[in-house]
Amino acid sequence: HVLTVKDCIADNFLQQIILVPEQHEVIATLNLNGDYISDALAAQVGGIGIAPGANIGKGIAVFEATHGSAESFAGKNRVNPGSIILSGEMMLRYIGWDEAADFVLKGVKGAIQKKQLTFDLARVRAGRKFIRPKSKEKHTAEEIQKELMALVPGATLVSTEGFGDAVIDNM
């Protein structure tokens, strides 16, 4: 294996990693820049709600969601569980359980292809059509479903539990 070290400033690196990601296999950086980089890259594939995370060292590995905790959403059954599900998929692959990992990946892909989406995934699939809410007022599930249908026709808004069930159903 050949390791090429390329030192660059953070703003230029963010541009390069988004424009030519295939030029980078390993990134070593400080925590703050790592947070910016991982969030920017997560946005390219669906956001932090779907991006898995792993910290792998010699003989030890930790797999976790890439986002922090969101105490304000605790117990509300509406946060995208994709990040932790895909972190589990990476863990299964790491320990050599490739067949189980393949089932998890198939389930996540199937749920998204069938448009069984948490609201954050609907925004990503809709692309630039997404309009940010004008206020921070709370919306009913029916209002959110109506907006979801406008963003992604044929989509079904699912809860945390609903997305997990959709993953299982699509395995």
Which role does the model predict for each range below?
Residues 1-11:
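Glycine-rich phosphate/diphosphate-binding loop of Rossmann-like nucleotide-binding domains
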